[in-house]
Amino acid sequence: MDELKKETQNADATPRANLSTRALMAILIVVAVGIGFGKIVGVDSVPDRTMQNYKLAQIPKTMEERSKALRDKGVVGERYDAEMQRIYNALLADASKARPTLCANDRSRWATIRALVEKDARVYRFVPDVSSAEINARLKELQEKGIVDDGRITFKYYPEEILVNCAANAPERFEKKNMKAKRYVKKLVPYAIDKAWETPGWDSIDVVKHGLSDEVWRPENPSSGYLYSSKPPLLPTVMAAPYWVLHNVFGLSLVKEPFLTARILLVFYNLIPLAIAFLCLARVVDSLGGSEWTKIFVLASAIFGFFCLSYVATLNNHVPGFAAISIALWAACEILLSGRTSGWYYICAGFFGAFAVACDLPAAAFALFLCVALLAKKPKKTILSAIPAGLVVAAAFLATNYIAHGIWTPAYAHKRDHMDLQRSLAGEKGNDSDSNEVKFSFDPNDWYYYAYYPAGRPREMRYAALSHWANRSGIDKGEPSIARYAFHSTIGLRGVFSLSPIWILSIIGAILWLFERRSVAGESAKEGDDASLTIGNKTRVTKLLAAMTLTLTVIFFWFFMTRDQGDRNYGGVCCSPRWFFPLAPLFALCLTPTLERCAKNRALRWIAYAALAWSVASAFYPTWTPWTSPWLYQIAVDGGLFTPY
């Protein structure tokens, strides 16, 4: 009886599993991959699908009305059949609104991928072939107008001289029909998305506009400049490779077979990287030690307690960034914990640490921590393997950015504080009692503030529009109060810890790791033996992870809290504080010491269960798309407790 009682007490103290830890981890990962695949297969823009179904249902009625009208006019025979077929095709094209792109954010990247792969989506400009005399005359003219580049006078074309191969302004027809005296030279505009933008349903607000170095760029002129994704071009360039294979080898197209093509690509872009990331995290969790219950809980939190699977069905930078950090952590822990000396691990750590920065710029602090830790362990290996691998990514990031924009800095570095600008312009208008005109403030260095021709409209001045970012509305106006933004980003309606309270246990765990004298698992090891050396090494690694997690948390919050008002927008309309995605792998690992203590107390275990359940609910609240407001925010708005943006 005593033995049975003792066994029961032990069962209460530390939950035990019937299966091995690794088998249970494998089951969790397989379930996650299945959920992710299901989300990808079901990807659809529900509002667009609803509109399509409605319009399709109206086609028979419209066709009947058009048929009656034609017969009343005496149209019969082949002419009648041809006209009815034309009407049907037009109605069908107008009704076809369904698409696998879920928001402006992912359409911006999809458009870049299309521009890199599809010949019909590439933007070409046609510039006049000028003589040396014309060049000299233009240089003199530009000098008189004060149009210079870094103090230098260089030849530039005026916007009205340039023809672009857009649907409403085709230079091929221009040349053949009008046969101007000048000869035009065809030149590719790399990464420009003007052509992809014109495809119905492919427009986006996450775009910038600027001219090329040999053009006079006038943002107030809708014919001047070219549209580009506002996202750094490296990630779409990498993603263009699988699409190139699908498009050129198998004949699939994002225009003709959008759902099939997008679903296949999302498996490569998101699902496979996530599966690899989960495997890497499982390996690290297993290496850090702890009870079976703790290990399974940590991995379950990383997979289901955060928003990785929420974003699996949309093209974004956060999932690849999460995967890159997870792989870099695995490689680093293999070096620091398991004593791996192969240069392959250093290359992985350096390459994926840098790639994480390419996906999420604030992850630069993570890459720096990683580099310092590896330098302290093996300086020579780090210098010869890890750092060069990271520099390859850095070089690719800069090169693709320069090819796209003709400058080293990314597009989002070329903008002003638009909300401050709006207030300034509103004040000027208020002081000018004689003016009822809307005031504008165009700046060639602000790529977000421009005039453009909306997709599907004729390229005429009466149809020109001002960019979304120059006339912000809703949540894109940003949060005026930094204190309010800090509150809602942490424990408020859109907070990291209010939506995912499991990460509160992570912060506690990081503090426990940082100040513990020895790993809990090493209490029985004797000084000087192999076990003691292993435990000491593990303690150093856990302290490093703790310091990294706490430092990065502070850096991330400081970085995003100090942005301009327009950037304090909670990541736009989305289900989570997505700016903090890079912290998720670190938060997951730092759960370990907290859960080890929770495992010994039933009440604490139930607190951990409740925190995980709440976090899972937040992550799986968005059914069809992650680009929806968090459930806490929605409940507050529905209950009249909060005014919607």
What residues fall within each predicted segment?
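Transmembrane-helix signature of polytopic, membrane-embedded enzymes
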Residues: 252-257, 276-304, 322-323, 342-345
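Signature aromatic-anchored transmembrane alpha helix within multi-pass, membrane-resident enzymes
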Residues: 20-29, 348-351, 367-368, 387-395, ...
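Membrane-lumen/periplasm interface segments of specific transmembrane helices
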Residues: 383-509, 552-560, 614-629
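Start-transfer (signal-anchor) and selected internal transmembrane alpha helices
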Residues: 1-88, 266, 286-287, 381-389, ...
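Membrane-interface transmembrane helices that cradle and orient dolichyl/undecaprenyl
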Residues: 8, 12, 289, 318, ...
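Perimembrane helix-loop-helix junctions
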Residues: 334-338, 365-399, 418-419, 509-523, ...
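Membrane-interface alpha helices of multi-pass inner-membrane proteins
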Residues: 113, 298-299, 303, 344-360, ...
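Interfacial juxtamembrane loops and adjacent helix segments
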Residues: 48-110, 115-268, 415-483, 564-568
